[in-house]
Amino acid sequence: MLENIFHLKENHTDVKTEIMAGITTFMTMAYILAVNPNILSASGMDSEAVLIATALASFVGTALMALLANYPFALAPGMGLNAYFSYTVVLTMGYSWQLALMAVFVEGVIFIALSLTNVREGIFNAIPMTLKSAVSVGIGLFVAFVGLQNAKLIVNSDSTLVTYQHFKGATFHSVGVGAILALLGVVITAILLVKKVKGGILYGILITWLLGIVCELTGIYVPDVDAGMYSVIPTAFVSFDFSALGETFGQVFKTDFSGVGLLNFFAVMFSFLFVDLFDTLGTLIGVASKADMLDEDGRLPNIKGALMADSIGTCVGAVLGTSTTTTFVESASGVTEGGRTGLTAMTTGVLFLLATIFSPLFLTIPSFATAPALIIVGFYMMGSAIKIDFNDPSEGIPAFLTILAMPTAYSISEGIAIGIISWTIINVITGKAKEKKISPLMYVLTVLFILKYVFL
């Protein structure tokens, strides 16, 4: 049966290898179960509900990837997009999280249509390999920057925008100790990875969390709710009570549009559409590139199935109560362990489903314990930099601008926009358009991005 569904022999793999690869993928990306509630709760959403929604959305999206595309890629609510949801749409723009969920749902429906009409596939294939590699690197820096913020290793500064945390003062036993533990977590995780310990990222989270528990029990770490530093000692381990999901499930259809206006809603929806389109393509590019699954022309075979899984997963996630569901770069860890088919993804998906009963445990994991995972994931993404020809300025400069823009603009989509505009203009003006065989779609995207900056 499994052979008929996943074509194991054709892909030179077996059931044992695929299952072990799926477990490895889960171990390297399980941190999202702790990180996503931390980020989305900033928008006012119930953290326990978000955790359950995250696990269920991850299961649905990953299972669809297995069945529709037969790829060993796992999906979950994406980093970057969840930050955009909370910190930009809700906290900065002032909209409710229910309206933000509706925007995610609507753009998911639109993406289903775009996937059926090959628009998303066309955009994926039109982006040059140099920019695809740069996107992977830029996402890595962006995710690492988010990790530094979550650990409070980087804080706001009136003079320099951001600065490193000062470990002295009244908040030392809360914020300061948390930042120090995050640094230790990075070192511990790095050692585990150097020693090739499977699931080293997850073990790094658990060890850092354990150190936090020891520090709290000994009085070194003192919770400070006002500073966003909570108790790290769990009061429960398992729960079969999923009633918390009611706080977010279906709320997308109870959006209050009063005082928002149709134009304002479409502005929010378009923002999600724009960010999700290029964040998703960027992440998929990064994962496929890291896993060496792109063909010699930079195309991903059977990409339509992967995009459909992504689109449907986003709609389901919005109904459950979480931000956009997308492919995770950590899927490459399962590929490294030999995963080659959807059986790897299905294994990961089932593990996410089982994780729902451990929600009390995951909710206690502090942000300083998950931050090292984000920083290390950033390191993994940097590997694509070696594929960029920095000796050729027409290739290297647009790639550099793409990489630079993502963490500095706090936006993956802005990095892609800057990269596409600069790559097209530089190569056209220098007479390299014919040599580079620039796709007509690249010209269209360049014009659209320029219009976006002029009018939006």
What spans do the regions from the language model cover?
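Membrane-embedded alpha-helical modules
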Residues: 93-210, 346-456
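Helix-loop-helix junctions within the multi-pass membrane cores of secondary transporters/permeases
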Residues: 2-36, 57, 78-87, 91-139, ...
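Hydrophobic/aromatic residues within the transmembrane alpha-helices of Major Facilitator Superfamily
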Residues: 23-30, 63, 67, 144, ...
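Alpha-helical membrane-protein architecture signal
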Residues: 12, 16, 184, 266-270, ...
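Juxtamembrane transmembrane-helix boundary signature
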Residues: 58-79, 110
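Loop-to-helix transition at the N-terminal end of transmembrane alpha-helices
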Residues: 44-63
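Residue-level signature of catalytic and energy-coupling elements of molecular machines
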Residues: 19, 39, 123, 199, ...
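Helix-loop-helix hairpins and the membrane-proximal interhelical loops
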Residues: 1-49, 165-168, 205, 209-303, ...
